[in-house]
Design a protein with these regions (language model features):
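Hydrophobic beta-strand anchors of alpha/beta hydrolase catalytic cores
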Residues: 178-180
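Blade-edge beta-strand/turn elements of extracellular beta-propeller
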Residues: 38-45, 83-88
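Non-catalytic accessory segments flanking enzyme active sites
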Residues: 4, 66, 73, 85-175
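Residue-level recognition of a conserved intra-blade site in WD40 beta-propeller repeats
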Residues: 56-58, 100
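A flexible loop/linker signature enriched in serine peptidases of the S9 family
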Residues: 3-31, 42-51, 65-76, 91-93, ...
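Short loop/turn segments that connect beta-strands within beta-propeller blades
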Residues: 34-38, 79-83, 124-128
Length: 181
């Protein structure tokens, strides 16, 4: 049985912080419970992103889930037997929802990136290939978008905060612009 909860649930077996520290209560983790022995094993204790939507595929016996990965929401595959997690290669930065096929090795998802609207894809999980099925970007045809660039900041503790900034359309580096934070 697949369980989801905070690091402190189930007696704190998902905690991955120093003794005396309290883990984040919005950091959802995955656990596997053996029904016969009632033993529970943390599957994502050392996995940094916060686990979000989760589906166990009956076709390949893998768990597919989305997770907050820096400033994106990525799609991941967990093989419970091997305790292996890998990122599923998809063409969008934000996977907003997905559904796994019941009898085929595929899933559908919708997502978006910094400079496009929602798009719907079908992913062949054996080939690790995405096929675009629906593109709502046409809804933005009259909207002029500027460029989006990655921007990382290192705080005083040495933590890297990943972010991005957006330049206005027709950006001229010789002009001054207000910054909206």
């Amino acid at each position: 049985v697949l369980l989801a909860g905070t690091p402190e649930c189930l007696g704190g077996i998902g905690k991955n912080v120093k003794e005396g520290q309290t883990p984040s209560m919005i950091d959802n983790q995955l656990y596997l419970m053996d029904l016969q022995s009632k033993q529970i094993e943390p599957l994502t204790r050392t996995f940094n992103p916060n686990v979000m939507q989760t589906v166990w595929s009956a076709v390949d016996n893998c768990v597919y889930f989305t997770a907050e990965d820096r400033d994106c929401i990525a799609l991941f595959r967990l093989n419970p037997a091997k305790k292996h997690i890998e990122k599923v290669n998809v063409p969008e930065e934000m996977v907003l929802g997905f559904s796994v096929a019941e009898k085929a090795s595929s899933l559908s998802f919708y997502g978006e990136s910094a400079s496009n609207s929602h798009r719907l894809y079908v992913v062949d999980l054996k080939k690790d290939a995405s096929k675009l099925e629906e593109d709502l970007n046409g809804e933005l045809k009259d909207v002029l978008l500027g460029e989006c660039k990655a921007w990382d900041f290192v705080n005083s503790r040495g933590d890297t905060i990943c972010g991005r900034y957006y330049l206005p359309p027709h950006f001229d580096p010789n002009k001054k612009y207000p910054m909206i934070v």
